[in-house]
From Swiss-Prot:
This is Regulator of DNA class I crossover intermediates 1. Residues 1-231 bind DNA. GO terms for cellular component: chromosome. PANTHER family: CDNA SEQUENCE CN725425. Its main location: nucleus. Residues 473-498 have a biased composition (Low complexity). The keyword RNA-binding applies. The gene is REDIC1. Involved in recombination, probably acting by stabilizing recombination intermediates during meiotic crossover formation. Required for normal germline development and fertility. Required for meiotic progression, complete chromosomal synapsis and crossover formation. Binds double-stranded DNA. However, also binds branched DNA molecules, such as those containing a D-loop or Holliday junction structure. Probably not required for formation of DNA double-strand breaks (DSBs). Keywords: Chromosome, DNA-binding, Meiosis, RNA-binding. One of its GO terms (biological process) is meiotic cell cycle. One of its GO terms (molecular function) is RNA binding. It comes from Homo sapiens (Human). Incomplete or abnormal chromosome synapsis and significantly fewer MLH1 foci observed in spermatocytes from a case of non-obstructive azoospermia. Residues 389-401 have a biased composition (Polar residues).
Amino acid sequence: MNWVGGSRSRVLIKQERRKQKEYFEKHRLKSKMKSLGVLSPVKNSAVSLDILNLYMVNQISCKKKIPETVRKPTHVNMNRDIKMPLRKHNLELTMSPHCVPSKLCLDDTETNVNCQRLSSKEDLGPVQSQGMDSYSMLHPQFSKIENCSFTPSSFSVELPSNRHISKLNFTSGIAPTPQKLAYEKKQNDQRSTVNCSDSLLSKLNKSQDVFSPSHKTTRFGTLFERLNSLGNRNLLTKSPAVIMDEDCRSTDEIRQSDYITEKHSIQHIWGKNGKEVSNFLEDVNQSTPNLLSENCDSFVSQNMINVLNIDEQRIKKTFNKCDYDSMGDTCVVTSSDKNHVTDRCIRNIFTVPELTFSNSTLNKTSYPEKCQPNKKYQREYNKNERNDLSTSFENDYYPSSSERKEKFENDYQEKTPQKSIQKYPANSMGNIPSEELHSKQSWDFGLDEILMEEGGIYSLKSKRISTKKISLDSAQSSRSTSYSPRPTDSCFSSSSDLPSEDEDQISQQIEDSNRMTIKTKEKMNNFYVERMAKLSGDRIVKNDDKIHKQNENFYQFSVKNNTDQFPQLQCNSAHILQNKTNDNCVLQAARCDAGIQTESESVMEEKLDVAIQCDLISKCTCRSDVSLCNLERCSGNIKADTTGGQEIHKNN
């Protein structure tokens, strides 16, 4: 029951404040007792605060100790009565040890240094630098010998470009004998007077062995000599490359610069004749091992020389086999090799932008009079080279590719009856120029000859052809088709009114496709050779994606058109023609996963666009592919989601 005027609430608030105050005071007393070490009182909460305070004061007073008086020591001055005068004396500071003056005769060294400065300002003559002071201070036993630490000799080589490149041969080490010093002075005078030529380089290399056995020739001087020697052509083109001790990369840079100097001359020889190119390559490949064998004593290993000899023999063999007509095969052979040094060098040679490397088919169009008599020989050579390249590449890089190949064929034989085939209208090939198709097919390594000999089945100039094309990724083609990572797109497009000629052409092409099964294994080899050329480097092939798709299209077309699936193809063609002629349908972009199709026909639904812009879901009569057709042609439950949210069920 509330009191009048809220007095009850005021009393309660006062009591709460008192309780809080007592609580905090108790905590303060406890903290003080703990700090002073006084025993805590009896744990009785009923004791009033005043009694508790008295108790605490009593305890504190009892524990308080009286401090003892500490006696301070009194200072007794013994000299209290005696007065001592203050002494004034200088401070003695610590001195450095007494230095003994050196007895060295520095007059000769000063005159030599002055002469050096004058001679270096006047002309770039021979310079003799002597670091005598520091060496004589550390080693006084050599104080009489002047030229002890550093005796560089210099000379200038006159080049055809009227440049004077000074070349220093730094030698440092223990001080030589006076006889050797006199001999070195004579050599320096002779070098400054004589105009250096090719004979002078050989004399200096011989004389260096005479007067420097006791010296330790620094590594920089010898490597600088090797760089600027006439054997290396790097002196005129670029600054000398940095040579690390025995690293093969430095030799690669030297070889690359040698090939760059010869790149301009090969562009003039390239268009004339294949024999001149082969002779030029033989000269280049003969010159490089000789250069490296001369300078191989410190930074070229024996393995590099062996590699160069192997490359030379291989290039000779390929040019002799190829009969100078198919340059593309030669480039593929050299680029598929494991030796990356010759790979980079050959790439530097064959950098003519106007020429694309093709095999005998492209040469057949450009030079028909050359390639026709050698057609059989080239076909045998291409076949052997493709087999060798595919087997060696599979053994080296993909050891399990042969097993994949067998599994790939078996799975294709099983899975091809369930896959749908892409069809284009009859006039689709007519719009594409024959030159573009021929340039795309030129990288198929002899595939064009097979197509040319089929009696005009796939002739490039005929325009009334409807191609069957299945676009698969290169990753799917290498795997078995029992599992497909992503669905492949099979695009169906046809016009509403097809003439009867198209039906005849489709049936004729299905019959002709059975003839292509004989060439399946050869196209398998072509497929793997093309894939190997792609993996060996994208520096040869610029339009790699187009070439990939073209190879896969030819390969899959040949594999799919077997005799086992001939009735299936007839059924598909008849069924599609029925949909084309009877229905006013536009078949567009139907997606179907080739890897998960089974023999049972799956019922597929589709979305239909009607004039009121609502999604109509229906079951198509074909039940194999998704298509967009009119509302009257579809049977099944049609659910129209209108804007008002109503559901309409119709049965047509």
